[in-house]
Design a protein with these regions (language model features):
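Signature of long, low-cysteine stretches enriched in small and polar/charged residues
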Residues: 77-135
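Surface-exposed amphipathic alpha-helical segments
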Residues: 121-156
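Sec-exported extracytoplasmic/periplasmic mature domains
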Residues: 39, 80, 84-87, 145-152
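N-terminal, intrinsically disordered, polar/charged segments of Gram-positive cell-envelope systems
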Residues: 1-21
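Short, exposed beta-strand/loop patches in secreted or surface proteins that constitute
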Residues: 13-14, 23, 40-43, 52-53, ...
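Extracytoplasmic/periplasmic, Sec-exported soluble proteins
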Residues: 15, 26, 30, 67-71, ...
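Stable alpha-helical elements in mature extracytoplasmic
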Residues: 34, 75-79, 136-143
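Secretory pathway targeting signatures of secreted, lumenal, and periplasmic proteins
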Residues: 24-74, 102-107
């Protein structure tokens, strides 16, 4: 719909993980926890998502966003399309409703987790310099399990 008045707003609350903030997207309903000292320098105009960056330097970033699955893509189609587009062999994993694809490009590690539903898609991408992989890997281990998709069976 063109009217945004009925759209729930984003929420930031205390996470069950100590020292973390829980972000819940008002439009798509997905949520993710991130370290308290990280900043949110970018919020998309259409309410689809945000960018979260390390306060110490912006080399470590978490992007989360949702989009409607208007093309009716399946999990396998989304996954294969991304791997093909990037064209880099990396780490992959998948479940019934999600996949993970992690690879290295231009000196950066990019870790993507995506939930694909018939109505909508929720995506999280964490990226960091290869030189900071110990910090980045630990961030992925802490943050990735907190990423919950909301209701992807419907469009938002």
């Amino acid at each position: 719909s063109s009217s945004q008045s009925g759209t729930a707003s984003d929420a930031y609350s205390e996470s069950s993980i100590e020292g973390y903030t829980l972000y819940t997207n008002g439009r798509f309903g997905y949520s993710i926890a991130y370290p308290n000292y990280y900043l949110v320098p970018y919020v998309s105009e259409n309410g689809s998502g945000i960018t979260i960056e390390d306060n110490n330097d912006d080399e470590i970033r978490i992007d989360v966003w949702g989009n409607n699955n208007s093309a009716g893509e399946t999990l396998d189609e989304r996954f294969l399309s991304l791997v093909e587009t990037v064209g880099i062999e990396g780490y992959t994993a998948s479940g019934d409703t999600w996949y993970v694809y992690s690879y290295e490009a231009n000196g950066r590690v990019i870790y993507t987790k995506e939930y694909v539903g018939s109505g909508s898609i929720a995506t999280m991408s964490i990226s960091y310099p290869r030189s900071m992989s110990s910090v980045g890997d630990a961030l992925v281990e802490a943050v990735a399990p907190t990423f919950e998709p909301g209701d992807t069976s419907v469009a938002h």
